[in-house]
Amino acid sequence: MGTPLKSNSFRVLFCGSGELGKEVVIELQRFGVEVIAIDRYADAPAMQVAHRSHVVDMLDPVALRSVIEKERPNLIVPEIEAIATPELVKLEQEGYRVIPSARAVNLTMNREGIRRLAAEELGLPTSPYRFAGTREEYLQAVAEVGLPLVVKPVMSSSGKGQSTVKTEADIERAWEYAQTGGRAGKGRVIVEGFVDFDYEITLLTVRHKEGITFCEPIGHRQEDGDYRESWQPQPMNDLALQRSKEIARAVVEDLGGYGIYGVELFVKGENVWFSEVSPRPHDTGLVTLVSQDLSEFAIHARAILGIPVPVVRQNGPSASAVILPEGSSTEVSYTGLEEALAQPGTQLRLFGKPELQGRRRMGVALALGSSIEDAREKARTAASSIKVQF
């Protein structure tokens, strides 16, 4: 490892500069890494802690290549879906190193690629699904899958463009929202049948130089396609946990590379279904900032740098609750911090996002408790204490 801002520096470039990337940037800088952050807008969270930043349309392959060739990073770390991933494949072929790999990024940032890999190549259990690229194909897919179902753009995250279709009256609206709400604009959708599950988990799965390490399962509650709260550890029976690890291992081993993967799974009794996977820290994993001795961000930093990842120690029942205001402002301010942090074992992260347009995740409350329910209650109370001023 060299010295930041010197000729011998080890440089990491982040494609995307959100709150998850911000935490990884901080962890990398603990190891003396020089970090460059890029995104489509200025002053994004990770930009605020990086050594330097660039505003780039990451869906433009020419613009993306230009900034990468200018910076010549040792590692390229994609943080969001809206990236010209075929260009990353070309850059990797030219000698750049993409985390965890350009193939993994290309597959996982497109729901069609990863679902076909999991269900059709690896033979893993999933919900029933169809893909559609036109309105006519969509209507046919809805008829084949049957109601109720979920419609998602193949390129989106955090619930953007996602709808639940329970009645025929919802069908047309879901198609239109998928075409306008996805991060990459109009395009193909996945029509996904409901799975009758007891709960859903994120299994953080780390692929590093010494093998694969699993964190304790994270339970979470979704609303409108985005997570509202998460907790760790999620209680599971032994067989369900074993099957979850087998599914996660199969996916992560196939995708390869080093780093942390957030593997999303549905669980009912002893049965487990694969849902999705992200090749980077997961938003539900924000809870690991208090629940583990090494957060998912610290683990990711170690793994991508080729540093061994030891057994991760759990700190006890922990929870996170999202701060999710709705409004419009370019000068957001917050009150209620003293009240939010009054309880022992409670922490807060305000992400520093430069503007609020509509509904946006602006922070998260974190709590340790005597039980999962105690931790969840403390986190929810802390989150609700924060008042967002527009």
Curated annotation (Swiss-Prot):
Self-association state and partner proteins as the record states: Homodimer.
Binding positions (N(1)-(5-phospho-beta-D-ribosyl)glycinamide): 19-20, 79, 283, 353, 360-361
Gene name of the encoded protein: purT
GO cellular component: cytosol
Annotated source species: Marinobacter nauticus (strain ATCC 700491 / DSM 11845 / VT8) (Marinobacter aquaeolei)
Family note: Belongs to the PurK/PurT family.
Cross-referenced SUPFAM superfamilies: Glutathione synthetase ATP-binding domain-like, PreATP-grasp domain
Gene Ontology MF annotations: ATP binding; magnesium ion binding; phosphoribosylglycinamide formyltransferase 2 activity; phosphoribosylglycinamide formyltransferase activity
Protein name as annotated: Formate-dependent phosphoribosylglycinamide formyltransferase
Residues holding Mg(2+): 264, 276
Top enzyme category: ligase
EC number assigned by the record: 6.3.1.21
Segments traversing the membrane: none
